[in-house]
């Protein structure tokens, strides 16, 4: 985390509320439909719907929210590796390790 990120980091209470919203969204038909693709948004590997996790494209810790356009299904491996990276940082990482998301 850069010093500039620390200055603008979201309030922990805001992050907690957003995580609560995400838990509720996981129970919705909308999320079930999103997982029905049975593949990871990032690496495109075939993944059973029940094993797909919810990822914030722009992480909560970097100012993201639970708007539906910011939530994607991804495999645990990608979610664990992506952590708090922004989309451009994640694409650079994927290019380095040889996995591409066009």
PLM regions and their residue ranges:
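Short, charged surface segments at domain edges that flank catalytic/cofactor-binding sites
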Residues: 2-42
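Cys/His-enriched microdomains
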Residues: 38, 52, 69, 73
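Short, non-ligating residues that shape and space the ligands of small metal-coordination modules
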Residues: 49-50, 81-85
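Histidine-centered catalytic micro-motifs used for acid/base chemistry in nuclease
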Residues: 53-59
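Short beta-strand-alpha-helix junction that forms the catalytic/metal-binding core
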Residues: 63-81
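Short acidic DE-rich linear segments
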Residues: 99-102
């Amino acid at each position: 985390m850069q010093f500039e990120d620390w200055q603008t980091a979201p309030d922990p209470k805001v992050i907690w509320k957003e995580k609560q919203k995400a838990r509720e969204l996981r129970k919705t038909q909308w999320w079930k439909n999103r997982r029905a693709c049975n593949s990871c948004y990032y690496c495109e590997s075939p993944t059973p719907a029940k094993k797909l996790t919810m990822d914030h494209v722009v992480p909560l810790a970097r100012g993201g929210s639970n708007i539906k356009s910011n939530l994607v299904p991804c495999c645990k491996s990608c979610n664990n590796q992506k952590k708090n990276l922004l989309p451009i940082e994640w694409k650079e990482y994927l290019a380095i390790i040889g996995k591409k998301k066009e």
